[in-house]
Swiss-Prot record:
Species annotation: Euglena gracilis
Localization terms from the record: Mitochondrion inner membrane
Main location: mitochondrion
Protein's recorded name: Ubiquinol-cytochrome-c reductase complex core protein I, mitochondrial
Keyword NAD: no
Quaternary structure note: Component of the ubiquinol-cytochrome c oxidoreductase (cytochrome b-c1 complex, complex III, CIII), a multisubunit enzyme composed of 10 subunits. The complex is composed of 3 respiratory subunits cytochrome b, cytochrome c1 and Rieske protein, 2 core protein subunits, and additional low-molecular weight protein subunits. The complex exists as an obligatory dimer and forms supercomplexes (SCs) in the inner mitochondrial membrane with cytochrome c oxidase (complex IV, CIV).
One Gene Ontology CC term in the entry: mitochondrial inner membrane
Membrane topology value: Peripheral membrane protein
InterPro entries assigned: Metalloenz_LuxS/M16, MPP/UQCRC_Complex, Pept_M16_N, Pept_M16_Zn_BS, Peptidase_M16_C
Modification after translation, per record: The N-terminus is blocked.
Essential cofactor(s): Zn(2+)
């Protein structure tokens, strides 16, 4: 008996799927006179997520105050004029609620998961910690060691460190090139109460904040609460709109204690609000991922290229696992990191050094680049439809739960000014043709820019000593197969 493909199943169920999407509750949105926005998606039930999303992250920092947005997140839980830290914690426990926050490169979010009846008190606490936090010098000094410990935990994760290096190489000299936690010197000494207060004054303004609700929420009630607690926020200065300059290059850090090689390669793309953004989402899904631990029966381009024999006429050899069945590539995953004005599309690979299909580990880059170039020029109808269907499924899965929905609403309201209905997103996705992707792929992956990593075969590399171990190498990456990498690219290795 033949098992039908995922594409054929979804093709036949598409009409029913569209009706289900049309029946979904709409996202309601209003704004206060000061620009503060309120957005919500309600559904039947007893629980919900309410939170405040703020257009303020590490990209709006400088090298001098790098880390201040994340430091502020910690300080806002230390107490206000009418609530101590213990009062805030007790208030959450009394409601059976959960208070949390996160800081990213572009956004900061504070949210509460609670019962419907407790929404007014939850918003009261959120407004209090955001607008009335005391942020004393004593609390500031006490929190430094906590953040240092958090930084040590993050730096123990190679993937986190590598992605920070990737952003630093791609966007050096701009806010997107800065890490979220900031350097150790800033955390331990440089960040002051004055810096934090200035950051709040500049970025915590009406037009850059939104109250978001998802689940058992009443939109009218949220509007009243927003007017009560956030109506007096200043409009502030317009958000900076400076162009983020993509530089490219490569960074490498040697760690003899790590038995595996981690490699990340990325290319400049348009930002999340660009008309081609949805096509880049499909391209990311098309490339997909491969994991040796999950087996090799996968359908993504990366997975199939690793599993199948891959012959390179230039080298005259097959690139495949050796006869003993040992595959040196542990994983190969595509990613897209989009921001408001720019993005990074690329892949992250983990492999055993010196064992990459009989060549040096740098051949992972060359091998993966061949697949990137192939899909940017020649995509079959089957893999194209599969990628679109998988993107639909992935999008639906990411919207599971009130917190995920609230986060989606908050980020879209800050990025686009409104949330795109899921049905509209799927209609846009269905309208994309294979030719559209073939048009966008080369423009992203093969573009020639004024700066970047240059040809892999040529150029000098500057050596910079890092105090915490290893050498950090900057400059063009040499490739033993002598294949150029597009200039608008960035390479990081650890």
């Amino acid at each position: 008996m033949t098992t039908p493909s995922l594409s054929s199943i979804l093709r036949h169920t598409r009409p029913i799927f569209k009706e289900t999407l049309r029946a979904a509750r709409p996202t309601l949105q209003n704004a206060l006179p000061n620009g503060f926005r309120i957005a919500s998606e309600s559904k039947d039930g007893d629980t919900c997520t309410v939170g405040v999303w703020i257009d303020a992250g590490s990209r709006w920092e400088t090298e001098k105050n790098n880390g201040v947005a994340h430091f502020l997140e910690h300080m806002n839980f230390k107490g206000t004029g009418k609530r101590s830290r213990q009062d805030i914690e007790f208030g959450m426990e009394k409601m059976g609620a959960h208070l949390n926050a996160y800081t990213s490169r572009e956004h900061t979010c504070y949210y509460v998961k609670c019962f419907k009846k407790d929404v007014p008190e939850a918003v009261d606490i959120l407004a209090d910690i955001l607008l009335n936090s005391k942020r004393t010098e004593q609390d500031l000094d006490a929190e430094r060691q906590t953040i240092v410990q958090e930084k040590e935990d993050v730096e123990a994760r190679i993937d986190e460190v590598l992605m920070d290096h990737l952003h630093s190489a791609a966007f050096e000299g701009s806010g997107l090139g800065l890490s979220i936690l900031g350097p150790l010197e800033n955390i331990q000494k440089s960040i002051t109460k004055g810096m934090i207060d200035d950051f709040v004054k500049t970025h915590y303004t009406g037009p850059r904040m939104a109250l978001v609700g998802s689940g058992a929420v009443d939109h009218g009630q949220l509007c009243d609460l927003a007017s009560k607690y956030f109506g007096a926020l200043p409009t502030g200065q317009p958000k900076p709109s400076g162009f983020t300059r993509f530089l490219g290059g490569d960074k490498r850090e040697t760690n003899q204690l790590n038995p595996l090689t981690h490699v990340a390669v990325a290319f400049q793309t348009p930002g999340i609000s660009h008309p081609d953004a949805i096509k880049i989402k499909v391209l990311e899904q098309l490339l997909g991922s491969y994991s040796r631990d999950k087996g090799e029966a996968a359908y993504s381009c990366f997975a199939r290229a690793i599993v199948m024999d891959f012959y390179d006429p230039k080298v005259g050899q097959f690139f495949r696992p050796n006869k003993a069945g040992h595959n040196p590539i542990h994983s190969l995953n595509a990613f897209w990191a989009p921001y408001s004005d720019v993005g990074l599309l690329g892949f992250y690979a983990i492999a055993e050094p010196g064992k990459s299909y009989g060549h040096e580990w740098e051949n992972i880059l060359h091998y993966a680049m061949r697949e990137l170039i192939r899909v940017s020029r020649n995509i079959s109808e089957e893999e194209f439809e599969r990628a679109k269907n998988q993107l639909k499924l992935q999008t639906m899965l990411q919207l599971d739960g009130t917190t995920n929905i609230a986060d989606d609403i908050g980020r879209q309201v800050l990025s686009f000014g409104a949330r795109v209905p899921l049905a509209s997103f799927f209609e846009q996705l269905d309208a994309i043709s294979r030719e559209d992707l073939i048009r966008v792929g080369p423009r992203v992956l093969l573009r020639q820019g004024p700066r970047g990593g240059g040809d892999w075969r040529h150029g000098q590399r500057a050596r910079v000593r890092r105090p915490a171990g290893g050498d950090l190498l900057r400059g063009p990456l040499s490739c033993p197969l002598c294949t150029p990498l597009p200039r608008q690219s960035v390479v990081c290795m650890a």
